[in-house]
């Protein structure tokens, strides 16, 4: 909450300036950017604040595809999996929210589960419950949707995770609240459990390794 509060305030301010499509905006994004730069030069804004506001102004130009964790490296769970099976899978332990896919088609994400909810059910000895019993609905966006739209929807719905799909509805990646905040700050938020900081780079490396294996 402490981290996101100033971002929410600035985001709402900038959104308010440009939200009306019926009325001509009195100030353009370029003018706001120029004013912020002048403010930074005169000491009104610190360098980090200037950078953050500039990033906020660019959110409409950044797509989900640019910041998402690609599906090829995302950890997802099958809906028929029991809570016992889920808990035994170490790959899920570092994530608080895990997308759940249809058992007949892993390109179709049905929702997500909260790790905390699973731990609570396990504490009640409900080991044989399935993920489908506790699944939650998840927000979905197109690969081409901009980050500003994703940010506003996540805030409005009080959600922290969203699924990115292509034009056919197939799973292409994940964008979290953390991803959007990192984009705003212009820096990566590294958790103590994070092992890979650039998931898109990891996806490229994984694809290259698969191609090399196929050509042997």
Q: Model-flagged regions — what are they?
A:
Residues 1-23:
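Alpha-helical transmembrane segments and adjacent TM-loop junctions that form the membrane-embedded core
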Residues 23-216:
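Soluble cytosolic regulatory domains appended to membrane proteins
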